[in-house]
């Protein structure tokens, strides 16, 4: 993912069942925080994720692990950008750092 370039990623969310568990980088997962999981982006990378609204998230976990999905955002971010009711859909994602 090139810095500053917007791409469409198939995005889902996670939270229930994972809240309070350790993320891949050793942090405690907070389902309301502005965080996300990606398979290869370095921990600490920031992304602007847009659906109906936008939010800046920080990569602190690995995933998603369901075929075809490219980004997992926290439950809180899904609610704030309007993806929660849809569940899975393409979002516009821009790498900020």
Task: Locate predicted features.
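Secreted/periplasmic proteins
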Residues: 2-97
């Amino acid at each position: 993912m090139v810095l500053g370039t917007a791409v469409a990623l198939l995005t889902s969310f996670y939270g229930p069942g994972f809240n309070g568990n350790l993320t891949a980088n050793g942090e405690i997962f907070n389902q309301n925080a502005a965080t996300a999981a990606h398979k290869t982006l370095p921990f600490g990378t920031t992304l602007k994720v847009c659906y109906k609204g936008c939010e800046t998230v920080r990569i602190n976990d690995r995933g998603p692990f369901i075929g075809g999905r490219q980004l997992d955002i926290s439950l809180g971010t899904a609610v704030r950008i309007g993806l929660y009711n849809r569940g899975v859909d393409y979002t516009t994602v821009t790498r900020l750092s």
